[in-house]
């Protein structure tokens, strides 16, 4: 058997990178091996990956030299950033620059960069339908990623631009799950009206990324993934069915959502408005059938709920 191609995974202890690492490790005959980047090889998450067969390497996306060392001898690399750790487009741009330069220096043959749209292509700063944030962005956590695509192109790194969707896991971890109103009734609240919102299970993002690495014909291309395109009402109905409690869908205006006051509420309010205002463009870029071709295990929203129903906080 030929030697396995090494895929270096940033964010290996997080949702996207962890899903990719587990997908590769679950396919011992797939021809790929995992080198997981971690800042702490003694963390429980790092040890869990090592137990599955991952090679651990200590590196940091803020340290370009450490990335060059981590990428040495690898075939491919999965690059992802976590905007919500710092809320800084400038920091994100610096991290992506480090990744792109390190990938070029290491001779990476296939990079998969987890990105999103630069919404300013649709909503220029002069468009007042939504507020401009941090002086020069509409949806900072989208725009910073989309703007950074050029780092890989300019560096000459063979890259697939991998556009993700709304994580359904946000209903578990990000405080978006059903909340009780004054009368005790449960509801999810989103500023989406009756528009469809492409979404996906976080674990499926990693599985789809694995599918991309098996498709060198996707180098130089932009791809988008989703498990389903449900409306808010459809998600509430699925929750009611699977969780066994009546759950309503409350649609609010983007202005109301932006006013909720939690960290990032303005960014997310603008994001949901972008989803709704450009429903056709955003959805068309995220084909469920294409996603399933990358990942035959792709879950629908109801299937994901069924697996995770005990993890969704209520109230």
Q: Each PLM stretch: what is its role?
A:
Residues 2-47, 62-72, 79-93, 101-112, ...:
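Oxidoreductase cofactor-interface core, primarily capturing Rossmann-like NAD(P)-dependent enzymes
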Residues 1-2, 314:
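Universal eukaryotic N-terminal targeting presequences
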Residues 250-252:
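NAD(P)-dinucleotide binding in Rossmann-like oxidoreductases
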Residues 53, 189-192, 222, 286, ...:
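Short, functionally important structural connectors and interaction interfaces within domains
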Residues 49-63:
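Rossmann-fold cofactor-recognition segment
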Residues 96:
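Short amphipathic alpha-helical/adjacent loop interface patches that line ligand
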Residues 218, 254-315:
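A hydrophobic C-terminal alpha-helical subdomain
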């Amino acid at each position: 058997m030929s030697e396995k191609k090494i895929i270096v995974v940033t964010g290996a202890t997080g949702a996207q990178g962890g899903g990719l690492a587990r997908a590769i490790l679950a396919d011992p005959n797939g021809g790929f091996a995992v080198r997981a980047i971690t800042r702490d090889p003694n963390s429980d998450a790092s040890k869990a990956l090592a137990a599955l067969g991952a090679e651990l390497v200590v590196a940091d996306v803020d340290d370009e030299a450490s990335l060059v060392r981590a990428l040495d001898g690898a075939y491919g690399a999965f690059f992802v950033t976590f905007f919500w750790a710092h809320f800084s487009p400038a920091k994100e741009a610096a991290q992506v620059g480090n990744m792109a330069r390190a990938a070029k220096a290491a001779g990476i043959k296939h990079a998969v960069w987890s990105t999103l749209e630069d919404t300013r292509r649709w909503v220029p700063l002069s468009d007042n339908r939504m507020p401009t944030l941090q002086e020069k962005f509409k949806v900072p956590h989208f725009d910073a990623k989309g703007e950074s695509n050029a780092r890989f192109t300019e560096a000459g790194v063979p890259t697939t631009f991998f556009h993700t969707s709304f994580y359904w896991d946000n209903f578990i971890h990000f405080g978006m799950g059903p909340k009780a109103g004054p009368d005790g009734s449960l509801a999810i609240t989103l500023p989406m009206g009756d528009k469809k919102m492409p979404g996906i299970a976080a674990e499926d993002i990693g599985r789809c990324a694995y599918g991309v690495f098996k498709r060198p014909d996707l180098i130089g291309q932009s791809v988008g993934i989703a498990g389903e395109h449900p409306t808010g009402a459809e998600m509430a109905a699925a929750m009611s069915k699977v969780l066994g409690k009546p759950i309503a869908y409350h649609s609010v205006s983007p202005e109301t959502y932006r006013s909720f006051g939690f960290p990032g509420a303005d960014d997310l309010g603008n994001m949901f408005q972008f989803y709704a205002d450009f429903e056709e463009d955003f959805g068309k870029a995220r084909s469920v059938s294409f996603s399933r071709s990358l990942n035959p295990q792709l879950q629908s929203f109801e299937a994901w709920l069924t697996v995770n129903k005990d993890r969704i906080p209520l109230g």
